[in-house]
C-alpha cells in the first residue's frame, strides 16, 4: 500500500493540505477518520468529505492531518484486514505502528507490534541459516 505516500501527496500538494496545519497527532480526529473509513463508500468520496468538513467548520486546521491519516489508514486496513480476530504483525516506527494497531483493533483484529528492529533481527537470523559464499 502507498498510504504514507498518498498522505504526503495529499497533505503537501492538494487543496486538502491548505486546510491543515502542522501539529501533534490528534487521537480524536484520527479516530473520526477511522470511523469514516468504515462507512460505506469509496476513498475518493471520503477524501472529498475532508474538504467539505473543513469548509463548513466541522474539521479544524489542527485536526485535519490526523483525520486524513485515520481515513487513509482506515481504508487500507479495511481492504487488507478481514476483521475475523486474526493477528496482524506490525514492523516499523513505534508511532506509526501505534496508529495501525488502533485501526486494526477497530476492525476487530489484534495487532502484534514488533518494532523497528524486527527486520534487522530477521535478516540476521536468515544470514545465520544461509551459507553465504
Model feature map: region roles:
Residues 1, 101, 107-117:
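Short hydrophobic/aromatic-enriched beta-strand-loop microsegments
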Residues 1, 5, 42, 64-75, ...:
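Conserved active-site and cofactor/substrate-binding residues in soluble primary-metabolism enzymes
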Residues 85-103:
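Glycine-rich phosphate-binding loops at beta-strand->alpha-helix junctions
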